[in-house]
Amino acid sequence: MPKRTDIQKIMVIGSGPIIIGQAAEFDYAGTQACLSLKEEGYEVVLVNSNPATIMTDKEIADKVYIEPITLEFVTRILRKERPDALLPTLGGQTGLNMAMELSKNGILDELGVELLGTRLSAIDQAEDRDLFKQLMEELEQPIPESEIVNTVEEAIAFAATIGYPVIVRPAFTLGGTGGGMCANEKELREITENGLKLSPVTQCLIERSIAGFKEIEYEVMRDSADNALVVCNMENFDPVGIHTGDSIVFAPAQTMSDYENQMLRDASLSIIRALKIEGGCNVQLALDPNSFKYYVIEVNPRVSRSSALASKATGYPIAKLAAKIAVGLTLDEVINPVTGSTYAMFEPALDYVVAKIPRFPFDKFEKGERRLGTQMKATGEVMAIGRNIEESLLKACRSLEIGVHHNEIPELAAVSDDTLIEKVVKAQDDRLFYVSEAIRRGYTPEEIAELTKIDIFYLDKLLHIFEIEQELGAHPQDLEVLKIAKLNGFSDRKIAELWGTTDDQVRQLRLENKIVPVYKMVDTCAAEFDSETPYFYSTYGWENESIRSDKESVLVLGSGPIRIGQGVEFDYATVHSVKAIQAAGYEAIIMNSNPETVSTDFSVSDKLYFEPLTFEDVMNVIDLEQPKGVIVQFGGQTAINLAEPLAKAGVTILGTQVADLDRAEDRDLFEQALKELDIPQPPGQTATNEEEAALAARKIGFPVLVRPSYVLGGRAMEIVENEEDLRSYMRTAVKASPDHPVLVDSYIVGQECEVDAISDGKNVLIPGIMEHIERAGVHSGDSMAVYPPQTLSQKVQETIADYTKRLAIGLHCLGMMNIQFVIKDEKVYVIEVNPRASRTVPFLSKVTNIPMAQVATKLILGQSLSELGYQNGLYPESTRVHIKAPVFSFTKLAKVDSLLGPEMKSTGEVMGSDATLEKALYKAFEASYLHLPTFGNVVFTIADDAKEEALNLARRFQNIGYGILATEGTAAFFASHGLQAQPVGKIGDDDKDIPSFVRKGRIQAIINTVGTKRTADEDGEQIRRSAIEHGVPLFTALDTANAMLKVLESRSFVTEAI
């Protein structure tokens, strides 16, 4: 059936900020879909609150609204734009929930807007636990016995009838939020109570636990003519019981018989047909390893994390095709863009194995609860492709960037057997490494399979890897063993370790004996048809399929898996850099390992290498492609860290040179440069041990800011107020980088701001200055940033511009750089300089309309700013106010403290823009889900050093009609200044403490600051946790609370007695 002509204008809802459970895969899907709809001639209107994505670029849709995804704003845009149809299935859970809300409020009917892709009834049937159960019963598909409950008592009664363990799943929440496995009544009570609060419809499903079954997923597509196909099936290495987003996954499934595959395939296709979904859908099933029994676990009636993985694993572009199906095209009329010759009706066939491993944030959150369960915790993932399981698994391990280059963490060799087995049984994020260690200690695959329910097939592969390690150890320099190791994915570094030599010598030996990888094409059809996609992976085998072209090429290194501190912003810069390379007439080659992102979409670059970002893997590509040079400044710290080894190997680094990168990163060289350029910085010193640090701090005076050099996202960075805390920091945190000393700086409490600049070596363009709302001490990635600055004097802005120019020229910067300043008493100090693209590039590019990464790339390739039409200096500022606000994922991470400090904790960002600061702030708060009603109660629990300031805020809250509550000390201080606050009890004062007030819904906001001593704050942590769990707005910085007050004041009328 040809595409529909009765609709012209389509609105697409994006997925909003990146949070755990809903990451960059939706940026990829949404970008694909919008372009796909435009290609068919429709007018596309996009709404998304996330500035960090390619999806919210002007070129992606005809009209792009970066506005909050809330009923209020989406309705406004619908009324203004009057689209004919709405496509909600590409915006993750956010998009689906928004569509439901619009429909339930009658907005879609009122405006005559039709839903495309998935019918509302299908969303309901898949998401509402009760309807889903009914549908499965009608289709005679087995599901675990379960009951819908609306109260804790009902849950306990049902569990008594089926027996523990049971699983709790709240309705309409994302990534398993609020759910969990319960082994007894106490756990059930706790998890259900929390789950009911988090479910927008206060219902939970209590179901029999089928933990230990194999978890299999099918990615299916269907069109309006009822054609349906399986794009790909995937098997979790971890059995049921661990969220699929936190599981290691292989595609295609490895351990099912043909009969089992057909059985689950039929089930998946019958489900998508029953739901009448037009587009993509993901079905998760549990298969009993000992019989042919299976259960349907859940269905996602939309494009999901797994579909991004399936798209990259097979090359079959699910989101692109889902958009075409939504407007009436059928699978047998759409050409598969990968082959360019076959139709989309052909099911992909794979002649390789794909491994996906999640990337967790526990390197940043050492206190976080690492046990894995039904609630997702990973921030990102890596994917690797190989010709066997060993190869793809080991390539994925070294893609993770957690300091491992093999399936082993050397420290685990020291762990006792008891601890080892406990970690093998109770899965944490690093279980693979514990299981591998158990095999090295001689536990048999049978024993481990019994303990973990991991299929013995995979454990045999781990055993095979260990056997190769032993062979290597026994036969140093043996070429035959070397070949076997390389066929199974071993890195040069691991081989060197086992041979007692260097990676470099192993590489030389390989090159001399022509043991080099070949590159194979990902073509969706196992090479049955000719394919035109330039999408490759390495393997050691015959016949290289990646042919070097005659055109000069430039290689861009991506930023690897998404983690806190290095998010989708860097992918954004990578994609823009590629556009500029192509515009300059070169062939653009991308190398990256992240399946969720736009940069690894084969249609973005001229060639894509899906490979780990390690020196060995990058050099192999360079040896084959012989590019003009490599661009490292858009791939975050991942790419910057490769600059030095690549340069040493004779590779041309384009842009700022390695010596100059070092001058910005190395403390002593940087100080030297600032002295020469006559630019002030807070006094500081370097220390390599505890005594030196204590000495330095005494000399500078407390408070001091301590941090290791060469890290991204403020890892292991702290503000320390006294010697005792400093010594404990030196003992626990310095392991962050032993070769690099620790920096001890005077901590200046002032106004913080940052600048991104672009330099051609002679002139410097400064697109804008961003002022932080939170004063210095909160990591820049966790601060709200305002552009243009609202409180900086003209003189300060001129000084900032002047210092920026001096630094860019003085450090021989070519391309992008980011500088952070702190201002105190009108004096400007430089805190740090990053000679690369930073996480503010997408935001600033959007609000100034300067495509910064593209401009920087053109300069790197030899053009000048004046040739591109830009002036030297500060760019004229926008007349509107724009705010970038952070978004956190604390609900997913138990035991992680939500207190903001110099270590970054946010996973994503939103943007609010309007004519005034207050309006822009309102939008930013709404978009980041910080919604405050116009009246209610606010509770203050404030450290002594901030009580003065808090008093002023409390008075203003009172003036607009808020009730003020406070903890004992704060209440006494307020009272002595004539403000009566209702006192709340200490933690543990049964019904009178803050957590119990929060549970009863009597508190609308919490303002909690922490004093100089970090140690005595367990009460504060409980208070903050209760706010997070119940979705009560929490402010740990008074500046943020002040910004929220500005919004509330601007929205309320002042009532004064005469």
Swiss-Prot record:
Cofactor: record remark: Binds 4 Mg(2+) or Mn(2+) ions per subunit.
NCBIfam families assigned: CPSaseII_lrg, PRK05294.1, PRK12815.1
Protein family per UniProt: Belongs to the CarB family.
GO biological process: 'de novo' UMP biosynthetic process; glutamine metabolic process; L-arginine biosynthetic process
Residues that coordinate or bind Mg(2+) 3: Q820, E832
Annotated GO MF terms: ATP binding; carbamoyl-phosphate synthase (ammonia) activity; carbamoyl-phosphate synthase (glutamine-hydrolyzing) activity; metal ion binding
List of residues binding Mg(2+) 2: E298, N300
Enzyme class: ligase
Subunit structure: Composed of two chains; the small (or glutamine) chain promotes the hydrolysis of glutamine to ammonia, which is used by the large (or ammonia) chain to synthesize carbamoyl phosphate. Tetramer of heterodimers (alpha,beta)4.
Region: Carboxyphosphate synthetic domain, residue numbers: 1-401
Domain topic, free-text comment: The large subunit is composed of 2 ATP-grasp domains that are involved in binding the 2 ATP molecules needed for carbamoyl phosphate synthesis. The N-terminal ATP-grasp domain (referred to as the carboxyphosphate synthetic component) catalyzes the ATP-dependent phosphorylation of hydrogencarbonate to carboxyphosphate and the subsequent nucleophilic attack by ammonia to form a carbamate intermediate.
PANTHER family in UniProt: CARBAMOYL-PHOSPHATE SYNTHASE [AMMONIA], MITOCHONDRIAL, CARBAMOYLTRANSFERASE FAMILY MEMBER
Binding site for Mg(2+) 1: Q284, E298
Any Pfam family the entry gives: MGS
Binding site for Mn(2+) 2: E298, N300
Natural source organism: Streptococcus pneumoniae serotype 19F (strain G54)
CC per GO annotation: cytoplasm
Domain ATP-grasp: 133-327, 671-861
Cofactor(s), by name: Mg(2+); Mn(2+)
Lineage: Bacteria, Bacillati, Bacillota, Bacilli, Lactobacillales
UniProt keyword annotation of NAD present: no
Gene3D superfamilies linked to this entry: 3.40.50.20, ATP-grasp fold, A domain, ATP-grasp fold, B domain, Carbamoyl-phosphate synthetase, large subunit oligomerisation domain, Methylglyoxal synthase-like domain
Pathway: Amino-acid biosynthesis; L-arginine biosynthesis; carbamoyl phosphate from bicarbonate: step 1/1; Pyrimidine metabolism; UMP biosynthesis via de novo pathway; (S)-dihydroorotate from bicarbonate: step 1/3
Binding site for ATP 1: R129, R169, G175, G176, R208, I210, E215, G241, I242, H243, Q284, E298
Annotated MGS-like domain residues: 930-1058
Name the record gives this protein: Carbamoyl phosphate synthase large chain
